[in-house]
Swiss-Prot record:
In the N-terminal section; belongs to the IspD/TarI cytidylyltransferase family. IspD subfamily. Coiled coil: none annotated. This is Bifunctional enzyme IspD/IspF. One of its GO terms (biological process) is terpenoid biosynthetic process. The record marks R156, K213 as: Positions MEP for the nucleophilic attack. InterPro entries: IspD, IspD/F, IspD/TarI, ISPD_synthase_CS, MECDP_synthase, MECDP_synthase_CS, MECDP_synthase_sf, Nucleotide-diphossugar_trans. Keywords: Isoprene biosynthesis, Lyase, Metal-binding, Multifunctional enzyme, Nucleotidyltransferase, Transferase. NCBIfam families: ispD (TIGR00453), ispF (TIGR00151), PRK09382.1 (NF006899). It catalyses: 2-C-methyl-D-erythritol 4-phosphate + CTP + H(+) = 4-CDP-2-C-methyl-D-erythritol + diphosphate; 4-CDP-2-C-methyl-D-erythritol 2-phosphate = 2-C-methyl-D-erythritol 2,4-cyclic diphosphate + CMP. The gene is ispDF.
Length: 403
């Protein structure tokens, strides 16, 4: 159930990531086909309890950032500082004009935060107003002196590995950062340490072993292999839809209102592009078709906007732990002309689905004046969707459609 707390998230992405090797800042490198920052931001942008996502960037990275997160919802990026601490402070100040109750501070180099982890972070602020996710230390830790000689073996039962997102009451962590800035303290490696410095009691909550920070080239190799193994079930589905023209002054195509001298005869808004995409995604899941989930006999779908149907299909993929790898739609019509609107349609599909625009294709063709599309009696559309799901041997059994 959604929380009543107004929660915002800061995604700290201003670092250069030199230890990760060549290839530019690590947050813009790809892992299993998607950028690290897109993976890091997605869980927060899609979370129902997070009303605002505030990125903090190196201003030189803005073009890379915009390309990586096309279609996501987020506030205008804030410029980062010389240290992580300064960058977080910049993000907090950017949120101050519309101050949330709770702020989650997350490193862009941790691309595997889950909705459940985010929910635990929000709930943990009820304890002391400051909380950090932790996981147990499983290795024996040695404390050494300047020469490298062991001088202590800490009790690992009392040690924890700290992660992000770290969660705070917004007012107290903003005040803590302002105090540190006034006192010239810029040496805190995480926000929990800064909170401790001002006297806050920092609670802990259950982290996630998979929510590891990508730091070295070996980290990228390891996580690439892990994701490939997790999403090894590659599915392809196809969709097809047709609507005849009727009275009206526009048609909806791929979520875009297109002026036209006719409208569609349809139960919903008649968006043939989105309807075909819904069928393609459901087909990849072996999960029925659009009519089985949204029957035209049901009056609640009368005049409904088709973006609802597409979001539903995308959520079905997410519920299976999957990712959409590619979406393609081809419209067959004489008019309206699709070419001038192609990129607008791609951007709209990206906005609805959260899929990167680089993974979305919109095409158009004619039937050379043959058939009903050639006579301009309507529009036909085909679509395909490629979906990656976690491999599950039990899926080899024929269990029928899920409805």
């Amino acid at each position: 159930m959604p929380t009543s707390k107004r929660t915002a998230a800061i995604i700290v992405a201003a670092g250069r990531g030199l230890r990760a090797g060549t290839g530019g800042p690590k947050q813009y490198r790809t892992i299993a086909g998607r950028t690290v920052i897109a993976r890091a931001m997605e869980a927060f942008c899609d979370h129902p309890d997070v009303f605002a996502v505030q990125p903090v960037l190196n201003p030189d990275d803005l073009a890379m950032f915009n390309q990586a997160v096309a279609g996501f919802r987020y506030r205008p990026p804030a410029n980062g500082g010389a240290t992580r601490q300064a960058s977080v402070h910049a993000g907090l100040e950017a949120l101050a004009a519309d101050a949330p109750d709770i702020v989650l501070i997350h490193d862009a180099a941790r691309p595997f935060a889950t909705p459940a982890l985010i929910r635990r972070a929000i709930e943990a602020t009820d304890i002391t107003g400051a909380a950090v996710p932790v996981i147990p230390v499983t290795d024996t830790i040695k404390q050494v002196d300047a020469s490298g000689a062991v001088n202590a073996t800490p009790d690992r039962a009392k040690l924890r590995i700290a992660q992000t997102p770290q969660a705070f009451r917004f007012d107290v962590i903003l005040d803590a950062h302002r105090r540190a800035a006034r006192d010239g303290r810029d040496d805190f490696t995480d926000d929990a340490a800064l909170a401790e410095w001002v006297g806050l009691t920092v609670a802990t909550f259950e982290g996630d072993a998979a929510n590891m920070k990508l730091t070295t080239p070996e980290d990228f190799v390891r996580e690439e292999a892990r994701l490939a193994a997790m999403l090894g079930d590659i599915r392809t589905g196809t969709g097809y839809d047709v609507h005849a023209f009727g009275d009206g002054d526009h048609v909806m195509l791929c979520g875009v209102k297109v002026p036209h001298n006719r409208g569609f005869l349809a139960h919903s808004d008649g968006d043939v592009g989105l309807h075909a995409l819904v069928d393609a995604i459901l087909g990849a899941l072996a999960d029925g078709d659009i009519g089985s989930h949204f029957p035209p006999s049901d009056p609640q779908w009368k005049g409904a906007a088709s973006d609802k149907f597409l979001k539903y299909a995308v959520d079905r993929v997410a519920a299976r732990g999957g990712r959409i790898a590619n979406l393609e739609v081809t419209m067959i019509c004489e008019r309206p002309k699709i070419g001038p609107l192609r990129d607008t349609m791609r951007a709209r599909i990206a906005e609805i689905t959260g899929v990167a625009i680089s993974r979305i294709a919109v095409k158009a063709t004619t039937s050379e004046r043959l058939g009903f599309t050639g006579r301009e009696e309507g529009i036909a559309t085909t679509a395909s969707a490629t979906v990656r799901l976690p491999w599950n041997d039990s899926d080899q059994e024929d269990k029928g459609w899920s409805t």
